[in-house]
Amino acid sequence: MPTVNTNNGQLHYDLVDTTPPWVKSPETILFHHGVAINSGIWSSWIPELSDKYRILTFDVRGYGQSHIPDESFEWSFEGLAQDVMAIADAAGAENFHFVGESMGGAMGLYLGIHRPDRLLSITPCTSPHNGGKVQWLVEWRDFIAEHGMEGWSERMMERRFFPGGISKDSEKWFASTQSSCSSHSILGHGEMLLDVNLSSDLGAITKPVHLIAADSSPFLPLTITSEIHNSIPNSELDVIAKARHGVVFSHAALCARSLRAFINRLEQT
């Protein structure tokens, strides 16, 4: 993976451009994952989109091959927004469609408020707008202290996926990746998110918004996604059935097709 240097360490990203030569100036879709995973979460989206779009993924600061800060690091949404811009600049993406899952989707809403000039559209997936309403976040620090990362990861897997909802191989990869993440990053992101409340600014978002929601997320009831939907004029909402919080992984192809149909509608207007 190529890297981009920032004032706070390197970020690793990957740009896939397999568009055929007759696709002139393909648009870029930038993907931002959430807590306790890496950019591999998007792997099954790529085949659904790469014939027409440049696919830009990266390991969010704190995960994967990107810089892993220590416990003293001061996390902020603005700092993570600057990371997104650094990745987009490195990939030559002046404008891009933004897709984010969980915390990453909240980042999309933040960018829609604070960096709208760079965005073509925003697709938040199982994402909050008010961290204080995210269920179970407040228990993370004590739970990790008592049960360790393995115990925390086991509980998270139950909340991300229905039993048998993903293949054995993908379940093994996800659980292993999640449990090996830095607890400092997980707690830093979780506690940062608790302080985020974008509620009063959602109505100012003018870029097209396509919300993808799981019908059974233990973290985000559909009522929360509906709040976002009702607060952003002309936003769309697609609810994926029989899915928990990890919908972008368990229902990757379905989510990618939902995104593609949304972008196709934008191109026709």
Model-derived features with residue positions:
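Conserved HGGG/HGGXW glycine-rich cap/lid loop of the alpha/beta-hydrolase fold
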Residues: G9-P69
